[in-house]
């Protein structure tokens, strides 16, 4: 066999080996994917939640239909683990991350179903032995509808949620409109802020308005003013909002807030958002920023 033939044979063998190795990797990934889908459909609650979380990070649109099926839960057994708000929360995030247009109708339908059971006085439970409550799940659904490709139906569903009796659902609807990022929703957002009484929801609505406009106008300074609110939860949310819109004008308000903020969780969030606005990581040992 000539040297040239040996060289060609070696190249072909090398390429074949590489292709074979890649095929094996793809097969393993496919098997892992289907294992997670199986757990999503028939595992215990913890396995279902972990599977939905895994599928969120894989972000494969192959998972959209299995996730939508799991989102519906078990309509015949209301207290079934399949209807867990924590599971619905995680599935909503996964579907939002996949940004598939076919997810919209199912997510909107499920939001309408569960939000009908959320009352005006219900409070979002971020941590409890049972996990998240229905308020959190409803909010996460409508928030993530805003991440999907635009449709008139999706936008109308989010706008309608802006009038929900519960403040957290209204705030989540504002987040959904922020995610949708369409200037034609500004009139409804401006109308909503004029009649909103709840400070947390006000911050979310202002956040959406400023995010869409990207202008340091009066609405932006109204948002910054909530960094002085009596409620730590509102101050925390306001800090996230100011950091998220990423306008340099927010630096002064965040620095002023940090000088007087005593709540540890809020302080840490302000530090993160200030670093985001100023474009660098603040030293942990700087006297001004120590607890």
Please state what every model-predicted region is:
Residues 7-15:
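Bacterial N-terminal signal peptides
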